[in-house]
């Protein structure tokens, strides 16, 4: 038997949670199983990028104010040193001068630690900062954290997403996970900003 009830949890991001409660009898004991699913915020074109992006690989706070007068590419990726994420980062590195010439700075974000980011940057000589969003606050506010399928199983994780943000901090374009081709992602961006 399933019972469905809603509970509003108010904290920093005012997320809503939906709890499913199932009763079952096991050895004469009542057991409750609960799973939490957040009601996702949907970041869309025309929305403002959060002012504080988080801490970079050096532990320094990164804010949108630091990019005033410049456009920013904020790209969310699942994990340092994995094949797709490395291909995407290297694509952005290889075309970094072209992106800069077009008026864009680049910032990556994943749930990896600052130490992991530092090693990733050093290993591939990445010229842009990476946000260590270990608490997933930025990823959730960007709607870049959610359920996805990996190896046939449903898991929670980072949804590879890229945001093109104008000089005023407003999202101009969003590349969804299905649109991103990691090996040529910088070329996709350059084509979109022509």
What are these model-predicted stretches?
Residues 32-194:
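Chalcogenol-based redox active-site neighborhoods
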Residues 25-26, 86:
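Secreted/luminal cysteine- and crosslink-motif detector
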């Amino acid at each position: 038997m399933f019972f469905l009830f809603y509970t509003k949890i108010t904290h920093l991001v005012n997320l809503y949670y939906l709890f499913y409660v199932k009763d079952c009898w096991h050895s004469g004991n009542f057991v409750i199983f609960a799973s939490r699913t957040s009601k996702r915020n949907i970041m869309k074109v025309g929305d403002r990028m959060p002012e504080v992006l988080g801490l970079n690989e050096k532990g320094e706070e990164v804010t949108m104010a630091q990019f005033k007068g410049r456009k920013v590419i904020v790209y969310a990726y699942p994990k340092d040193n994995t094949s797709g994420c490395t291909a995407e980062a290297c694509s952005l590195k290889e075309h970094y001068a072209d992106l800069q010439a077009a008026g864009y700075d680049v910032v990556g974000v994943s749930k990896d630690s600052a130490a992991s980011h530092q090693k990733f940057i050093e290993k591939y000589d990445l010229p842009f900062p990476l946000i260590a969003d270990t608490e997933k606050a930025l990823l959730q506010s960007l709607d870049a954290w959610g359920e996805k399928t990996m190896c046939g199983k449903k898991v929670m994780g980072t949804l590879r997403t890229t945001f093109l943000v104008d000089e005023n901090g407003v999202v101009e374009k969003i590349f969804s996970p299905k649109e991103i081709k990691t090996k040529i992602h910088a070329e996709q961006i350059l084509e979109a900003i022509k």
